[in-house]
């Protein structure tokens, strides 16, 4: 609100009248859903209200009240800002300022979100020359009331000063910068209907630059001008109508300006469009898929239009052309262009050839507007006959098998909808959301991200990112096999049933149709079937157990299959979300790969031989650090076999060096160091064991914003706990070396206290978890040997969750022998190895599971 006197009774009456009229319009929109009528009606209602206030303020006829921006277009969304310009003559009485201020205050009193400026014509032109945002808002200026002559003078001066070329360049740059803020993709899980790529702002930008150039201000006018076809104009109008309706519905549902399609509103928005949940898809998923298809079409058509407008504004002076494929394609100014509009109709196999040429031709940076338009209008050509054409199948395999350019080619094939036309099952997952709380991309974008990750392993310029993966793929024969597996690993998502099993059938059919036979075909199908296996073993099973390794090695069978699965697994996890991958998961996978490779090479997965090997390596490292030869014995004699199998040689050596003088310490020994794997802190705790120890340590981590990635808990023969934790700081850019000493001091002090365990903090769930909560699950069962109990917990992630679990265990005197903490984006799947004499009692098991479910409940 403006800083003026409280509204008068008359102002309050007008406000109520305005509010009632607006509410009536919104109610009609709820039932009729005619967004154009609503936006124009809201604009007229606002015009009439502002005219009355203008008249009441007695502003002279020499001034003009101008609507600018979306309001100037006559398109007001329910809770949009109302942007106005009070246009002054060059010579005006400064005494008018108070009346203008009163006018703006009274406009606010109506309940309008006013964005106002007060300028002369000269000031408008000056401001517009300095700021393209001002220039854009003035482009659609419309007189509401006041001097017609003054407004006409402004219009003439504005267009005289407007440089269409400079405006085009500025708006395209602005659009690129805006797209970059949204990661250059329309496929955000919470898109901004107005600002995201493929949103309303893209459509407005095109009409702005067309209007500035004098080409027209509507899709019909651009069609008449020849910049788009009648069909394209129809598509643009249809998608624009959908996006405007969606935005208006969001405003109405939220009761305020709301342009972001957030999780909380997706279901209500979907229901307002008449979508209803089915067994396979939520209502919100159906709406989002429609949104993504609309945004994708807008992105395609916007690219065509911008290139066409650019060609008219900046006619080429040196059209250097080279023939790339006789009678089909030429290169024109770095773009791949068809020789005429009938190429794809005469030669349907040229459709895929376009992407192969784009991929292999140096200097070609994209497809020209003419080529993009021809592709867009060739949908009927891409039919079953086209898909079955042996030449097309050969070309598709050539695209997959090139040494470079694969990722760019496939992204472009998806953007132009050619990929989904060629692989019909891929088309089914375009725009398919994944509500599993750790994928942040739609299924099609995730698949292309996995393909991109595999390709980066193979490109020398990126070898520093994941050197081990780059080394492996460099020695992997026919890496295109991995790319095919990547295309199919999630292709059956959203169909109901096991997507790995359904995807196998799709992959098998693809191999048969594309001449992939023998071991290559078998490997592709096997990878699709088992693409989750390695991550499940590495993150959820005890890989220090030789039996686990033996079973995994039997599933894999040979080195080629192991390497392929490892590379696909790393690429897959990294393609889910930037949050899900971390160096600790990378180490778990690499360790599993190396141990399994040794077993496949003939090494015996025997605990005794592995223990002996690690001890010898650890002793060699201790000698390098000048630890006396027999100094380790006092500690090692107290440790069981499990300790040596759970830690590698370097870790054993570090812990021995820290503890060999303190085997019978009376107070807690706490040591912390930056984790050798990076991006984490390793914390060692050595103290006399007690039932609440694990919970007490977790309480400290919880209170200090440290997230536990892994916990390895050992108990010595003489009753000491030797616990190791890998933790990360929730704050970014933390230097773990700087906080190591603080953690040592604070945690040692905390362990010396005898205070009862504090209440767990009830951390807030993220919006994603609140909107898509998962059912918490707790499973407690004895292990195969009956020595320990395995506790599996899955729940929405939140601060304090691990401590909540540990506290329940401590209250029942249940000791934690090992813990595998597995955070998958917004979801956790934790596994604990428990010891506790009473756990064989069924009543205790039921009580424990009940209390754990209560503790992890949202």
From Swiss-Prot:
An example of a GO molecular function for this protein is: [protein-PII] uridylyltransferase activity
Q: Where is this region: Uridylyl-removing?
A: 325-681
Which Gene3D superfamilies does this entry report, sorted A to Z?
3.30.70.260, Beta Polymerase, domain 2 (3.30.460.10), Hypothetical protein af1432 (1.10.3210.10), Nucleotidyltransferases domain 2 (1.20.120.330)
Show where the HD domain sits: 443-565
- Reactions the enzyme catalyzes: [protein-PII]-L-tyrosine + UTP = [protein-PII]-uridylyl-L-tyrosine + diphosphate; [protein-PII]-uridylyl-L-tyrosine + H2O = [protein-PII]-L-tyrosine + UMP + H(+)
Which Pfam families does the record associate with it? GlnD_UR_UTase (PF08335), HD (PF01966), NTP_transf_2 (PF01909)
This enzyme's EC code(s): 2.7.7.59, 3.1.4.-
Supply the alphabetized keyword list. Answer: Hydrolase, Magnesium, Multifunctional enzyme, Nitrogen fixation, Nucleotidyltransferase, Repeat, Transferase
Residue ranges, annotated region (Uridylyltransferase): 1-324
SMART domains from the UniProt entry: HDc
One BP term from GO: nitrogen fixation
Signal peptide residue numbers: none
Cofactor names from the entry are: Mg(2+)
Comment on protein domains: Has four distinct domains: an N-terminal nucleotidyltransferase (NT) domain responsible for UTase activity, a central HD domain that encodes UR activity, and two C-terminal ACT domains that seem to have a role in glutamine sensing.
As for what it does, the entry says: Modifies, by uridylylation and deuridylylation, the PII regulatory proteins (GlnB and homologs), in response to the nitrogen status of the cell that GlnD senses through the glutamine level. Under low glutamine levels, catalyzes the conversion of the PII proteins and UTP to PII-UMP and PPi, while under higher glutamine levels, GlnD hydrolyzes PII-UMP to PII and UMP (deuridylylation). Thus, controls uridylylation state and activity of the PII proteins, and plays an important role in the regulation of nitrogen fixation and metabolism.
Can you tell me which family this protein belongs to? Belongs to the GlnD family.
This chain belongs to the protein called Bifunctional uridylyltransferase/uridylyl-removing enzyme
């Amino acid at each position: 609100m403006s800083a003026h006197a409280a509204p008068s009774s008359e102002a309050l009456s007008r406000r109520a009248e305005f509010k009632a009229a607006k509410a009536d319009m919104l109610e009609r929109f709820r039932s009729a859903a005619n967004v154009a009528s609503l936006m124009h009606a809201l604009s007229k209602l606002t015009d009439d209200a502002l005219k009355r206030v203008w008249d009441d303020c007695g502003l002279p006829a020499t001034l003009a009240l101008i609507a600018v921006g979306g309001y100037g277009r006559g398109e007001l969304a329910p809770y949009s800002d109302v942007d106005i310009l009070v246009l002054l003559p060059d010579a005006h009485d400064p005494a008018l300022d108070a009346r203008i201020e009163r006018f703006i205050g009274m406009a606010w009193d109506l309940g309008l979100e006013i964005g106002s400026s007060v300028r002369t014509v000269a000031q408008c032109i000056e401001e517009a020359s300095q700021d393209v945002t001002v220039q854009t808002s003035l482009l659609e200026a419309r007189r509401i009331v006041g001097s017609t002559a003054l407004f006409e003078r402004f219009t003439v001066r504005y267009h005289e000063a407007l440089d269409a070329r400079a405006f085009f360049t500025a708006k395209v740059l602005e659009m690129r910068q805006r797209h970059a803020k949204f990661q250059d993709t329309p496929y955000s899980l919470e898109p901004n209907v107005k600002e995201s790529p493929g949103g309303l702002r893209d459509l407005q930008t095109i009409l702005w630059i067309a209007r500035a150039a004098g080409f027209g201000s509507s899709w019909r006018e651009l069609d008449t001008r020849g910049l788009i076809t009648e069909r394209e104009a129809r598509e643009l109008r249809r998608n624009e109508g959908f996006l405007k309706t969606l935005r208006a519905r969001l405003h109405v549902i939220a009761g305020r300006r709301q342009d972001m399609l957030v999780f909380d509103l997706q279901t209500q928005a979907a229901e307002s469009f008449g979508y209803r949940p089915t067994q396979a898809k939520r209502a919100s998923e159906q709406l989002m898929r429609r949104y993504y298809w609309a945004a994708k079409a807008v992105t395609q058509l916007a690219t065509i239009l911008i290139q066409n407008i650019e060609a008219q504004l900046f006619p080429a002076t040196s059209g250097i052309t080279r023939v790339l494929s006789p009678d089909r394609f030429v290169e024109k100014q770095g773009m791949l262009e068809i020789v005429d509009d009938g190429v794809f109709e005469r030669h349907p196999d040229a459709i895929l050839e376009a992407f192969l040429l784009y991929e292999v031709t140096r200097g070609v940076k994209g497809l020209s507007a003419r080529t993009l338009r021809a592709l867009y209008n060739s949908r009927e050509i891409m039919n079953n006959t086209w898909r079955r054409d042996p030449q097309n199948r050969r070309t598709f395999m050539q695209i997959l098998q090139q040494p470079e350019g694969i990722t760019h080619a496939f992204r472009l094939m998806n953007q132009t909808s050619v990929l989904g036309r060629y692989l019909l099952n891929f088309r089914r997952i375009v725009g398919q959301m994944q509500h599993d709380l750790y994928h942040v991309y739609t299924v099609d974008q995730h698949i292309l991200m996995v393909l991109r990750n595999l390709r980066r392993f193979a490109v020398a310029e990126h070898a520093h990112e994941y050197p081990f993966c780059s080394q492996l793929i460099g020695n992997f024969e026919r890496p295109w096999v991995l790319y095919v597996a990547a295309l199919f690993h999630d292709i059956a998502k959203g169909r109901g049933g096991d997507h790995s099993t359904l995807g196998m059938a799709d992959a098998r059919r693809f191999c048969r149709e594309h001449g992939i036979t023998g071991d290559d075909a078998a490997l592709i199908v096997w990878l699709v079937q088992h693409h989750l296996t390695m991550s499940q073993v590495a993150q959820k099973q005890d890989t220090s157990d030789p039996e686990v390794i033996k079973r995994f090695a039997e599933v894999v069978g040979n080195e080629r299959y192991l390497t392929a699965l490892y590379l696909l697994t790393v690429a897959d996890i990294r393609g889910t979300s930037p949050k899900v991958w971390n160096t600790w998961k990378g180490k778990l996978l690499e360790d599993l790969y190396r141990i399994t490779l040794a077993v496949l090479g003939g090494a015996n997965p025997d605990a005794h031989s592995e223990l002996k090997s690690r001890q010898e390596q650890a002793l060699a490292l201790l000698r390098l650090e000048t630890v006396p030869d027999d100094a380790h014995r006092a500690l090692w004699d107290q440790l069981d076999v499990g300790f040596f199998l759970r830690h590698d040689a370097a870790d054993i050596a570090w812990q021995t060096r820290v503890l060999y003088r303190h085997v019978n310490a009376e107070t807690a020994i706490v040591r912390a160091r930056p984790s050798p794997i990076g991006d984490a802190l390793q914390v060692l705790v050595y103290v006399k064991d007690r039932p609440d120890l694990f919970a007490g340590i977790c309480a400290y981590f919880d209170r200090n914003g440290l997230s536990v990635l892994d916990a390895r808990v050992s108990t010595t023969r003489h009753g000491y706990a030797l616990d190791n934790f890998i933790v990360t700081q929730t704050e970014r850019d933390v230097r773990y070396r700087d906080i190591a000493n603080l953690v040592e001091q604070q945690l040692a002090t905390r362990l010396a206290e005898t205070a009862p365990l504090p209440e767990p903090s009830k951390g807030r769930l993220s919006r994603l978890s609140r909107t898509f909560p998962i059912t918490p699950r707790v499973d407690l069962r004895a292990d195969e040997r009956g020595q320990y109990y395995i506790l599996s917990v899955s729940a929405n992630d939140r601060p304090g969750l691990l401590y909540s679990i540990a506290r329940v265990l401590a209250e029942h005197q249940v000791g934690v022998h090992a813990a595998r903490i597995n955070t998958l984006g917004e979801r956790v799947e934790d596994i604990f190895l428990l010891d506790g004499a009473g756990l064989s009692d069924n009543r205790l098991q039921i009580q424990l599971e009940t209390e754990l479910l209560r503790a992890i409940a949202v």
